[in-house]
């Protein structure tokens, strides 16, 4: 027996609904995390960079709500006391925090949020939002290649590069705290793998918020 076209269309619409995810990219400096993040933001309209709340004064050219959410110290303190941050920290006298409400609203409407953070920030987010978090760690093909990339920037002294290399090895030691590990020996190849991870995670059954009703509709005939 033929089904009702109107019902079929409704079920298709339901199946398209999904909950967004918090997509974390981490890597030691020079491994390509920032390049991959920029490519992802420029080529995928469903994901946006996480916007932090800060007490830092707004700089020329910055836009409130785009670069940061700028607040007074008293408001930031209130948000901390109200548990409105996934994580927060004080850096050089200014406070920075990841706001729960803004991110949860985006996830609810099916939008994804990109985080360019280190292993410590990743751990904090995962502890508070495990079901929504996808963790990807990007590795260099070798330490020699990482050193070559850092030196090739031409912006750091030998002492700074040495410090970055030491820090890189410390960060790499936390690779097993991630869901996926990708070796960046080629930017395009690495980017392709990261996009495949994102696409697969978007299709997880637990994120398909309209799937239950869709399947029930199919079973009713």
UniProtKB/Swiss-Prot annotation:
**InterPro entries according to UniProt:** GK/Ca_channel_bsu, Guanylate_kin-like_dom, Guanylate_kinase, Guanylate_kinase_CS, P-loop_NTPase
Catalytic activity line of the entry: GMP + ATP = GDP + ADP
What do the Gene Ontology cellular component annotations say?
A: cytosol
Any Pfam family the entry gives: Guanylate_kin
Q: Which residues bind ATP?
A: 27-34
**Places the protein is found:** Cytoplasm
GO MF entries = ATP binding; guanylate kinase activity
| All residue ranges annotated as the Guanylate kinase-like domain in the record | 20-199
Gene3D superfamilies in the cross-refs:
Guanylate Kinase phosphate binding domain (3.30.63.10), P-loop containing nucleotide triphosphate hydrolases (3.40.50.300)
Q: Is Secreted found in the keyword set?
A: no
- Keyword Repeat (UniProt): no
Its chief place of residence is cytoplasm
State the UniProt keywords alphabetically: ATP-binding, Cytoplasm, Kinase, Nucleotide-binding, Transferase
For this protein, what is the EC number? 2.7.4.8
Q: Which domain of life is it from?
A: Bacteria
NCBIfam families in UniProt:
guanyl_kin (TIGR03263)
Q: What family is reported?
A: Belongs to the guanylate kinase family.
**What exactly does this protein do?**
Essential for recycling GMP and indirectly, cGMP.
> Under what name is this protein listed?
Guanylate kinase
User: Which organism encodes this protein?
Assistant: Novosphingobium aromaticivorans (strain ATCC 700278 / DSM 12444 / CCUG 56034 / CIP 105152 / NBRC 16084 / F199)
């Amino acid at each position: 027996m033929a089904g009702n076209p109107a019902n079929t269309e409704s079920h298709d619409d339901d199946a398209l609904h999904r909950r967004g995810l918090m997509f974390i990219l981490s890597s030691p400096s020079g491994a390509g995390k920032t390049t991959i993040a920029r490519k992802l933001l420029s080529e995928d309209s469903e994901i946006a960079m996480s916007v932090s709340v800060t007490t830092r004064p707004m700089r020329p050219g910055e836009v409130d709500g785009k670069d940061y959410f700028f607040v007074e110290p008293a408001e930031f303190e209130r948000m901390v006391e109200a548990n409105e941050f996934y994580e927060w920290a004080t850096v050089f006298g200014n406070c920075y925090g990841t706001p729960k409400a803004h991110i949860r609203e985006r996830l609810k409407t099916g939008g994804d949020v990109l985080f360019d953070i280190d292993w410590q920030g990743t751990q904090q987010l995962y502890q508070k939002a495990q079901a929504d978090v996808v963790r990807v760690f990007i590795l260099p093909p070798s330490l020699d290649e990482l050193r070559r990339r850092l030196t090739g920037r031409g912006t750091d002294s030998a002492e700074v590069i040495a410090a970055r290399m030491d820090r890189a090895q410390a960060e790499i030691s936390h690779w097993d705290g991630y869901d996926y590990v990708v070796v960046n020996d080629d930017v395009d190849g690495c980017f392709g793998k990261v996009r495949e991870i994102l696409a697969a995670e978007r299709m997880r059954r637990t994120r398909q918020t309209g799937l239950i009703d869709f399947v029930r509709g199919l079973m009713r005939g």
